[in-house]
Each structure stands twice: as C-alpha cells, then as structure tokens.
C-alpha cells in the first residue's frame, strides 16, 4: 500500500515537473518541521553543471554509477550559484579528486549516513572559523567521522563520547602549540573511526556561549554524500585528514536475493512506519523528493538511518561496501526497530489505557454527582450527613442535657471541616451516629394497668407468683406516683424455671421495649462500659447499644447469668455493673465511648442467676432478689398441660391433629424422665414425643391412609422417649445403719443426697474420721464438728459405747461429680455417725437438714422450698428442719407441703429423738 502510494506520489511529482523551486520550498518547510532530527535528503544531487540541480535525483538504475554521475561537474562555483537561485538546501557533490584532503568533523554520536541530513554540534573554535571561512568562499565540504567509543579509542579521555570529543579538541589545540608547529605524539585522528562520510555543510549556526568556560560552539547541518576512508593526518588545529573516496561494491540489481532483500527492507520500513510517525514524515519526504526504493545501497543507508541502533552497529553499516551485506545489516537493524516499536506501542497503550480508564471514571463520577445534584437526589456526602444528623437530633434537642447538646454541636462543626476520606472523619461520623440516635429522654409509652399485666403474665407462665406479685406491685406504685422509676429485680433459681422467659413477659405486661444480654463469662469491662473512641473499631457498651436499638430510655433490660460474670485482666466487669445497677449512680452512667452522661434510671433491670453465692456482695446489695424454686410434679403437670404441650405441638405442626398424652403417661414422664427442678427438660421431652407423632402423621399422609387420633399412654412412652434414665437420688430403698438422707441446695435446685458412714478399722486409740465426695471446706469442718459432738453425745445416750474412740471412720457423700459445700449437712453427718455407732438405722423415709454447733444447737439453713420439693420428689415422708426455718416452711403453698411431715428442732437432742429414737 505504502509503496503504491509512494509510486503514485512520485508519478505526480514527475508530471508536475516542478523539480526545482516548488520542491525545494516544500523540502525546506519539512526540514524546518523536523527540526533537529536526522532528515533524509537525497544523498547526491546530480550537478551536471546546471544551476537548477538542487534535489534532482542522482541515481541511475545502477547504483554503481552514483558516484560518477554525482561527481560530474560538481563544483564550488556551481553550488554557490545554485544557492542563490533556490535559497534551499544545496545538494552538490564535489568530485572526489577535488577533495583529497578534508577538514575532519568529529561526530559525538551516530555516524552520518550518505543521503541523510544531520545536525552536529561543534565546539572547536578554530574548526568553526575555518568552516565559516570555507562557506564564505563557496561550498564547504568536510569529512564527518564518528568518534571511537571509549573502549576502542586510543585516547585516555574518559566519560561520555561527548567528553572524549571535547577532550580531543582541547588536546588538539594544546598539542599544536602557540606557533602552530606540529608536535610529536599520537595521531589526533586516531580517536575517530577510519570510515566516515564526505559531507556538505549546509548551515553553520553559532550558538551563544553558554558553557561555563565561555566556549564558543556552533551547530552544523551536514548532508552526507558518500563514504570516505581516512588515510592520515595532514594538519592539526583544525584537523585536516587525507582521505580516499569510497565506492559501493558492484552488484547485480537483478539478483534475486538483492531484490528480495530490498523488498523486505521496504516492507519492514512500512511496518516501522505503523509504529513511528516521525519516520513517516522522513519517508514521505524522502519519497516525495527521490525515488530510491529501487536503489538498494541508498535504501540500505536510509533504513539504517531510521534505526535507533547503537553507534557501533550503525558504523558497521557505514563500513560495509558490499551492497548485499549492507542490506542484510540494515534489515536486521530494521527488524529490531520494528520489535522495539511494537513494544513501545504496547507500553504506550497500556499506560494510555490506564490513564484513560482513570480519567473516564473520574469524569463519570463527576457527571453522576452533577446529575444527582441536578435532580436533587443527593447533596454531596458531607452535607447530606450533617443534614441527616441535624434532622435526627433537632426534635430531641430540648430533652438532651445541655453539655451533650454542646458536644453534639461541636462534633457537627468539626465534621463539616474534615476531609471525608480522613480517618478522623469516620471516627467523628460514627460518634455522631451514636450520639444522635440515642433516645435522650424519649420514653416509650407504658401500660400501668394491673389487670392487663396480670392477664399477660398468667398467659405466659404458670405459678411464679413471687415474680408476678413483684411486677404488679411495681405497676401499682407507678400508678399511684404517676411515674415509674427503674428497679433492679434479680431472679434466682435453678435452670429451666422460667427466669428468662418471664423477663420477656414482664416487658410485655408493662408495654415496654425488651432488650436482653448475657454476662455469663464476660470478662471485658468494655462490653458494659464501651471502648475509648481512640481505639480502632471502638464501640459503646451493651447498655448504649440497648438504648439505640430500643430507641427509648425506659426499656426492660434482662441481664442473664449475672452469677457467672467473668473476671478478666481488663478490669472487673462486676464493678462496671455496679455503676450500672446502682440507682444512685445510673442516672449519670458514663460510657467510655460516649463520654457524656446517660440517664439509665428509668430502665427496669431484670437479672437472672442460678445461685447468689457468686454474685459480688456490693452488687447483690443493690438488687431485689426474687427466688424461684423448682416445680413439684403437680406444677409441672400444669405447666406441661397449659403451656408446653401446646407449644410443642405447634412446633411440630400438629396444632390441628388429635394427639394426646394420658395423665398417667404425663406423670410418668415427669416422675421418671424429668425430675429436675425446672421444666426445660420436660419441654424437650414433649417436643420429642410430638416430633415422633409428626413423623407418623407425615408417613400416613404420604400413603394416603387416615390416621386415628393418637393417644400416648404409659406403655408407649418407651417408644417415644426411650427408657427412663437411672435416677441417682434414690439409691437405697431402706437405709442401713450409718446412711442418712440429707437435703442439699445446689445451682440445679434442691436435691436429696445420702451421707454414708462406715468403719474402716477399729482398735485402741484408732478413733479418726476421713471424708470423701467433693466436699468443700465448710462441709469438712461440719464433719469435724459432727465427729467431736457425736463422741460427747453418744456418751450421754449410750454410756460405755466407745465405738467412736476405737474406730477409724470414713464418711462419703455419693454423686461425686457435684461439688458440695455448706453447713447444712451438720445434723445429717452427726446422725449418720450415731446411727453407725449405735448400729441402728434411722427412721425410714426421713430426710434432714440443719447446721449444727459444737454444743448441739441446730441453726437455720437456706433453700427450704427447694429442699422440700426435692424431698417430695424422692419419696421422703418426714423432714427434720431447724426451728428457725419454720416460717419459711409455713410460707410454702399447701400443695408442696401436702403429704409431708415436718419436724422442727432447735437442739440435736430433738433430731436424735425423731431420727433414731422414733420407735420407742
Ligand atoms: P431459665 O431462664 O430459668 O433457665 P427459661 O426461662 O429459659 O428458664 O425457661 C425454659 C422454658 O420453660 C421456657 O420455654 C419457658 O417458657 C418454660 N417455662 C418455665 N417456667 C414456666 C412456667 N412457670 N410456665 C410456663 N412455662 C414455663
């Protein structure tokens, strides 16, 4: 394509037949445009003595003739006359014979290819003067030689080639001396390559002396004509060398290989043009003015001049007189150039892609912003944020404490001055997000209606009268006062008795929002009091989160498992809770994150715990404790029938299906499978039963059989829930001497336990006592007290019985997995020792509890209700309680006490009578 275009262009030029003026003006313009770049120009103008010879193609079909034809008639006079006619670049090739010696111009980089125009900087003042002188006399011709690179130079001048060049010119000046006489020494022309280019000086432009040492310099515009070999130095300062003008070796223009190589060079130049537009101009110019595409040696020179190869490679091309070799070398350089060009284009494209991608995104974002603004959809982020916060905060402004208002205003101010991408902006934004979304005195509506509350509470829970009463009282006080204050109610009881679920019902009864969190195992104070804002990812504590999520300042907050509060290295969460739960302090609760006081005094706190022992004293002091003991069988039946069964059926998708559990089966389920204090296990068992029923129903449905109503009786239970688990609380049907049933109160509720005593060995002075069964310190002390007391007591009851003095005893409390501690086993241990010593079993179905002093007094203990329930569960008929617990027992409801005989004692003597002396 390109070749064709070029040919067309050439034809056009020929037909226009404007060889001289028109072309020269255009070429000058192009030259100006290309500036300092190497410009291809026809190497040799055909002089023929004509004054209009500028830019006339010089070559014939055979390149060999170039020199001869270029040479004829070329003279300084004709050249100078032509310069006056055209005013453009003069191309006139002086005959070799007229230039056996030439001024040597050193080229710091890139050799000058014949046919090419190249600017060269010269700093040698004498050389410049001489050149100017020559030009004034007519045409100036020089020999341009590439400086040898450092490695190949005989000069010791180090550094860059330009430095070498400077050094050379200086040395040349120095070595010539003042009188101009030649001095012995190295040939100054050694620093140049031997093969150079015979060149015409077109222009000499003096440059202002800007170098620090004030050296003169000038730029020469050289047009290469033909190859030269330097033979020797004729004169120094300026350097004049003897030269031999070289001709290209003869070649056969019709040789296939030459043709093919030539074509390939043209094709490669074409390729090169695709990637490098600068070359395009060069070539266009070349093609417009000359027709060298059929002239292989010229083409090779042109191709080489287009390459960015290093000086050595270009010099090699210059030195090759064999046309074929030169074409090959050029082709190699061109191919490399094309590769580099591709790589360059690739890199350029990548960079461009990236830049344009980024720019595109930027423009699109800007556009989006302005579109949004235009449509009023969104103000810019910051303004929108500030507006949001202000809008949220304004309605509350009046109820917010003054100092908090100040903080919020300051923060809003700060936010407006911050850069949205800064981290500070985010911190402030989050802080404002919290500050503005807290309720700040906004209370939720409250239902202070006793009847309604009673209804709601009863609807969800059976029994639990203490808790329900407490809530009703709370409402009553609120009604009378016209306002409610926060309270802290703590429910203590075994698992599964409904502590958590009634918390929820309380909120429902009062019409308040509900929030629950568990502090079991919590060891980090920050969970309650928040992190300081300086921490990355800082958050307020649970209470502030609660206020935000409920949006009111008077929710019911259930703090679960308060007895299992952890204690970590990050401070003591119990103390933090203290601040929260102390009615004196929680009006101005200070969260670390929020840093402004928050009023929590309207919050109704409900805490749950299994035991009270582990709740820190000061915390316990601020709570109202409501005890929930476990349920007896009748209560469980009630709960199961009214609440759990319905829920379990519903969960299994059996609400509409007729499936029932008979009363007997229910009693067995409760009595044999779910004997613990709470009803969670019962709930699980009922769910299990109904899941199995659901499977049956689903199977029947899939086979399209109609199913009769399912009735689950005692015998079916094994199918539904398996065999009843082994019950450890009744090991003995009848207790042997030395074994007594005690009553204990643990985190799981009340339970019966056996205290076993047996003799290990006997002998004079062997009386001792050993205890096992996970007993704590208090219980071990109780054993020691019991042992001492029993010795004395036995003497009074059975004088002469020296069993205790002579026998080493072992007391054990089975159920070794459960840690047991507390003083309430005192009377039980004593009784077991006595029973063994007297070899007399205690009254059947008897259980006892009570602390014993060394003098035999029986002191009251805790957990009477739990113990009573546990005793009943284990089939105990008679219980011995300390006299001090009579009031507790009397408070128990009738159904718990039903069928039980309670004996109240204040001294051990009475215990003895009930337990060991009962049959008298
Ligand atoms: P806790 O918090 O005491 O361990 P939960 O409150 O989780 O126990 O109660 C366990 C389950 O037993 C809940 O589904 C609850 O509804 C049920 N439950 C407990 N006590 C009663 C009750 N008195 N009446 C009705 N359901 C109860």
UniProtKB/Swiss-Prot annotation:
Subcellular location: Mitochondrion matrix
GO biological process per UniProt: cellular response to oxidative stress; chaperone-mediated protein complex assembly; mitochondrion organization; oxidation-dependent protein catabolic process; protein quality control for misfolded or incompletely synthesized proteins
Domain named Lon N-terminal: residues: 102-338
Every Lon proteolytic domain range: 734-918
Targeting presequence: 1-58
Catalytic activities: Hydrolysis of proteins in presence of ATP
Domain of life of the native organism: Eukaryota
Spans annotated as Disordered: 65-94
InterPro entries reported for this sequence: AAA+_ATPase, ATPase_AAA_core, Lon_bac/euk-typ, Lon_lid, Lon_proteolytic, Lon_Prtase, Lon_prtase_N, Lon_prtase_N_sf
Gene Ontology cellular component annotations, sorted alphabetically: mitochondrial matrix
HAMAP family for the chain: lonm_euk (MF_03120)
Family as reported in the entry's similarity comment: Belongs to the peptidase S16 family.
Function: ATP-dependent serine protease that mediates the selective degradation of misfolded, unassembled or oxidatively damaged polypeptides as well as certain short-lived regulatory proteins in the mitochondrial matrix. May also have a chaperone function in the assembly of inner membrane protein complexes. Participates in the regulation of mitochondrial gene expression and in the maintenance of the integrity of the mitochondrial genome. Binds to mitochondrial DNA in a site-specific manner.
Name of the protein described by the UniProt record: Lon protease homolog, mitochondrial
Source species of the chain: Ostreococcus tauri
